[in-house]
Amino acid sequence: SEDLLAGMKELSRKADVITPNLTEACLLSDTDIAKATDYTDADSFLHFASDTAAKLRDMADGPQDVVITGVKCQKEETPFIYNIAVTERGVHTSRSHLFNRSFSGTGDLFASVLCGCRVNGMTTEAAVDLAGQFLYHSIADTMNDNVSPNDGINFEKYLIDLINATALQKKAT
């Protein structure tokens, strides 16, 4: 509904970090989502996504990092999925292999890893990279085990990688 969207816009302007997918980012920034289908190459499409993230960042009430998650570029020879962070330091693009199946909960898991990394002192850019790697390994493991997409992904055995990465970050600072 329009009231819900207005409320989400107001709430998202107050956050330090937001992680919308591209459709959500377009809705929050009043960007025409139909324009996303106008692009014939990955670079132009990714530029559209980063411009949308920058527009959202500019709408924030204060400093904000915007991470558009799960941007799928299937027009490339090898399809990839991207996460695009726009911060005060600029645009950071992280890509990973695009699997041919979607799994429940991966967006929530990405946001949780990002949040945990940020709380532990990582930059948003480093957190985006680590969250992407974490999901890649977890999804690959899940695909090998033939798990139903509705059952989520096998991420538990990769939690130690997150713990080690955040411990290294803390040592470095």
Regions found by a protein language model. Give the residues of each.
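Conserved phosphate/ATP/ADP-binding segment of small-molecule kinases
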Residues: S1-V91
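Short Gly/Pro-enriched loop/turn and capping motifs at secondary-structure junctions
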Residues: C73, N100, L135
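Phosphate-handling active-site elements
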Residues: V91-H92, C117-A131
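Short pre-catalytic strand/loop immediately N-terminal to key active-site residues, enriched for Gly-Thr
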Residues: V91-S104
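Short, small-residue alpha-helix embedded
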Residues: R101-T124
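Charged C-terminal helix
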Residues: E125-T173
